[in-house]
Structure formats: structure tokens, C-alpha cells
């Protein structure tokens, strides 16, 4: 069963903070989410397009995220647009700046998939960092991250059940339950203090939520309390979140759906739309783009070289 206690504590903490903090300076990323505000980017006037189309697209993406100023950003991409790769590349660049990074998603499978790409880029660039993957003890290792360096002396990402966190750790990967705020364990007089799970309360610089279209709004808020900046990665046109009940108003939406408000693509001044797919042939891409992505999705040059041989000579 899905454990809700930490998520309830997190939402309760946010509500109390919002009501009692007159400055509203804490949890700015979550505030931006619920108010559906424009991203706050350093050195960029609010309302301006986030990406300069005349410059290198990947470099522009990295620059925008680096300059995120206690705010929220959406990276939307159709299948084959490189959501995982660009997210991992951005994360590596942030780690190089000594930023504390979080990685989350609805499932451990999605988290591990992004971690594999992060590990691959770090090895290619010969960049070392220390990361942990927090798993449930009940999973008995089934959710563990298994990468190229796992179990070796050069291990980059260590699996843990969440009851210890190295001080020099720069990347933490976990589901909403682990990131959700929980009060520190109380000290009992005469007893040895217990070391509980790490308390994440804005001690991370960034959290990247992959497949954000599957993470409900409440969980997105709970995760957001752990960080100064929140990046939602996904595509509402792909798999939606699993729904087990009926929720009033916007409560049943994912964080991504809540921000897009029935728009097919994220506006130029609100987020980053990954415009090139390496998966779809031009004719197929044109149809998909016009039907679902406001004609913004284009086929990459590499797709021109692909052919599908159906071997239909006898038909």
C-alpha cells in the first residue's frame, strides 16, 4: 500500500508555513507552482521567451536552469526528444557547480533510468560525484539502482534505505515519500538519540521530477518543500498518473497538468519545449505535431536516413 503519512505531514507543514510566514519567502518554488507564476530567471525579464532560438539549444537549456532563482520550471518533450539526456546533462553541469541535486519520480524504475543517463555522462566526461539512491527497506533490493559503477570501488551512486546520508553527498534520488518532510525524531531524556531518515527541508538546490505527468499535485508539493528550485520533466500527452479515487477541483491533476491548464504545449515564456524528435519520420511527425503539439514538434535530421522495410512484395 502507498504510505501517506509523510505526505500529509508535508502538506500540513506547507499550509502552516504559508499562513504564518507573512513574507512568503519560504518554499518559493511551491508558491510559484500553486500560483502558476512565470519562472523567475536571473538576468531575464519575466514574460520574455526563455530560450534564444538563435543560439545553441542545449546550451540555452542549461543556462536557463542554472539561472533559476528559487522558482519552478517545466521541460516538456514528446517521445524521442531527449528529455532524459538533457535532464542528465543539466544535472551534471549543476553538480560541477557544487549544487545539491535531487531526482524523483512516481516509480523507482523512472528514477533509475535517469540515474543511468547521469552516470553515463559523468563517466564520459570523467566527472566524479557522490550520490545516494533511497530505497524502501520492504523492496528488499528490487528498487536498487544498478549502474556500470555499482558495486565497484568507483561507485558513484550508493543504494541506501534512507537512514543515513553522507555529508559530502551531492545527489539524492528518491520517491515523494522519502523527500516528504518529516519532523526530526524527538530526543528522549536518558536514552541515546535515534538517527532517523534525513529531513529534507529546502536543503537541496534543485529537484528534478521525471515523468512529472504521473506525479500528483500533492506529491509534487511535498517534494518541492525539500528544494529551492523545482524542475518538472515530462509530457502530459504520454502516460497520465494512476488514479485510485475522485478528487475535487484541481487536486486530482498532476503538477504538470496543473501548470499547463489544458494547453498542448508549454508557452515559450513559461518553460522549455524540446522541439526535435529523433524517433519520428517527417510524415508521421508532421501529423503528430499538428494534432497534439501545436505544430511545434519537428523531426531531427537523423530521421531522414531511416527507412521501414515492411517486405510487402506479395501484397
Region locations from a protein language model:
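ASCE P-loop NTPase motor cores of helicases and related translocases
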Residues: 1-178, 296-315
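Conserved helicase motor core of SF1/SF2 NTP-dependent helicases
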Residues: 96-98, 107-112, 117, 177-180, ...
Amino acid at each position: 500500500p502507498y504510505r501517506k503519512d509523510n505526505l500529509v505531514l508535508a502538506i500540513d507543514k506547507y499550509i502552516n508555513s504559508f499562513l504564518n510566514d507573512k513574507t512568503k519567502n519560504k518554499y518559493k518554488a511551491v508558491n510559484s507552482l500553486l500560483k502558476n507564476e512565470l519562472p523567475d530567471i536571473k538576468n531575464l525579464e519575466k514574460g520574455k521567451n526563455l530560450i534564444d532560438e538563435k543560439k545553441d539549444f542545449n546550451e540555452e537549456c542549461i543556462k536557463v536552469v542554472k539561472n533559476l532563482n528559487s522558482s519552478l520550471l517545466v521541460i516538456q518533450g514528446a517521445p524521442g526528444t531527449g528529455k532524459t539526456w538533457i535532464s542528465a546533462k543539466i544535472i551534471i553541469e549543476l553538480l560541477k557547480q557544487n549544487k545539491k541535486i535531487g531526482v524523483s519520480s512516481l516509480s523507482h524504475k523512472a528514477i533509475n533510468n535517469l540515474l543511468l543517463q547521469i552516470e553515463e555522462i559523468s563517466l564520459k566526461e570523467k566527472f566524479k560525484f557522490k550520490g545516494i539512491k533511497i530505497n524502501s527497506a520492504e523492496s528488499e533490493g528490487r528498487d536498487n539502482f544498478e549502474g556500470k559503477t555499482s558495486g565497484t570501488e568507483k561507485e558513484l551512486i550508493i543504494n541506501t534505505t534512507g537512514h543515513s546520508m553522507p555529508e559530502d553527498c551531492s545527489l539524492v534520488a528518491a520517491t515523494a515519500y522519502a523527500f516528504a518532510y518529516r519532523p526530526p525524531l524527538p530526543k528522549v531524556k536518558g536514552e541515546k538519540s535515534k538517527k532517523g531518515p534525513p529531513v529534507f527541508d529546502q536543503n537541496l538546490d534543485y529537484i528534478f521530477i521525471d515523468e512529472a505527468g504521473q506525479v500528483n499535485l500533492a506529491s509534487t508539493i511535498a517534494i518541492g518543500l525539500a528544494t529551492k528550485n523545482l524542475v518538472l520533466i515530462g509530457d502530459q500527452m504520454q502516460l497520465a498518473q494512476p488514479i485510485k479515487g475522485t478528487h475535487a477541483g484541481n487536486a486530482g491533476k498532476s503538477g504538470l497538468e496543473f501548470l499547463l491548464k489544458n494547453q498542448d504545449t508549454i508557452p515559450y515564456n513559461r518553460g522549455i519545449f524540446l522541439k526535435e524528435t529523433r524517433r519520428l519520420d517527417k510524415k508521421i511527425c508532421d501529423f503528430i505535431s499538428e494534432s497534439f503539439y501545436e505544430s511545434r514538434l519537428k523531426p531531427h535530421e537523423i530521421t531522414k536516413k531511416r527507412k521501414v522495410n515492411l517486405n510487402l512484395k506479395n501484397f
